[in-house]
Amino acid sequence: MAILTFALLGIAFVPASAQGRDIPVPRSCSPQVNTKLQEMIEDQPRGYVENVMVCGIAEGTRVNSGGRHGSHHIITLKAQLPQGRTVRVQVAVNDSLDGPVSALRGDQVFAYGQGYISGGGWAAGIHDVHCATHRTADNGWVVVNGQKTPTFCR
């Protein structure tokens, strides 16, 4: 009956599991923006951590073509943590879900999505920088020099 009521009123019914919260982009990049990132790096979790934000200055972008999850643009950032340390973080942008997003050396980048410990030359990474695809995630995004992708989520 509730679905019929929504249909009669012209309201779309979307399962709650597909709707994430919209988290605003900070006005400026400060070490405090990277607080949850720092906590994740200190904790070294084995799995993913939902709703992690990073901001920093891009070192550049490389493209990983193909693979199990499709092509990705990988943006490498230098991010300053609240305790004063600077770390390298990768932002993995899925070309199929997010569209290709890249950053040049020196660009300011913010990203919000699912965090992970990446190893190698990076202290951590952020992916799922797109509209929420599961119920425990907020809507993710990546912002390069003020240009946000995605621009909105349904």
Regions found by a protein language model. Give the residues of each.
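Bacterial N-terminal signal peptides
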Residues: 2-12
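OB-fold and OB-like single-stranded nucleic-acid-recognition modules
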Residues: 18-154
